[in-house]
Amino acid sequence: RNRSGSVLEVGVGTGLSLPDYKRELEIVGIDLSTEMLEKARQRVTELGLTNVKGLYEMDAGELEFPDHSFDTVVAMYVMTVVPDPEKVMRELSRVTKPGGEVVLVNHFSQEEGVRGWVERRMAPFAELIGWRPIFDHSRVMVCDDLKLVERKSVRPFGIFTMMRFQKLAEAKRIAAE
């Protein structure tokens, strides 16, 4: 995408995606894992990623940033592993600037078909490792000030979905209420 400005990556992990961002973007990453963040810092240093402005240990449900801090907020493979995805979604919206975007990549469960059957059978095993295979997309549709503008299947095998939301400007949000 032709994004510009500042990006918050929630659940940055070891920083595997950091080299993929355009160098013009200012990147901040957060994760709960100190060990993962250390690996991300090493990656930033080794690759000379001067556009990465900070990597912080932080809870996605209690972001320590002021309102409207970022042009884009990205959360890849995060929503099914956090204890309160609705709270996290509200926090992502809060720190996104009006007119900015929230981008999620996540697994969302399938109601029907072979995939739905497999997901229901695998759920008890997946939950043992902290993953929710039965996760409806409605759990991220909780913010009145976020408008879904794109939804599509992504690799591998189309089992993940990218959802792109636009943060409504204050005037638009009030008019929509």
Predicted regions and their residues:
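A short SAM/SAH-binding and catalytic strip from SAM-dependent methyltransferases
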Residues: 72-84
